[in-house]
């Protein structure tokens, strides 16, 4: 189990060419450019599926470490996860997580992990997505 504000698991290095900083804890999708990522958002298929989480802020034009699978403990970002509850890609804010599945027509539901404690999660992105009609 990781200490507070820590990520443990399998990592990959990817580039940020979004024009802004990808912040620690944001989930990302792979863009159409090799090795580049951007914050995922469940309201459009073009910004999904999420496959990794930033383990630190990654400035525009920089390459950073992204968690592909593992455990995250962050008492400032995760304050109300439900033990055993599913965690989803947000449909309202790019890169964010949500404890509630997207429900509006045209949005995509992707389970990204499971709450292990109020401020800990198992990050385990599931790649099948369901489109809400």
List where the protein language model places each region.
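Glycine-anchored, exposed beta-strand/edge motif detector
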Residues: 1-133
């Amino acid at each position: 189990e990781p200490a507070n504000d820590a990520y443990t698991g399998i990592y990959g290095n990817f580039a940020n060419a979004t024009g802004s900083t990808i912040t620690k804890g944001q989930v990302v999708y792979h863009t159409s450019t090799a090795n580049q990522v951007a914050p995922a958002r469940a309201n459009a298929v073009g910004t999904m599926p999420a496959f990794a989480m930033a383990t630190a802020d990654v400035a525009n034009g920089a390459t950073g470490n992204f968690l592909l699978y593992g455990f995250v403990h962050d008492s400032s970002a995760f304050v109300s996860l439900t033990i055993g509850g599913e965690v989803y890609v947000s449909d309202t804010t790019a890169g964010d997580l949500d404890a509630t599945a997207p429900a509006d027509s045209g949005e995509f539901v992707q389970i990204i992990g499971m709450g292990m404690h109020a401020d800990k999660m198992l990050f385990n992105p599931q790649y099948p997505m369901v489109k809400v009609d």
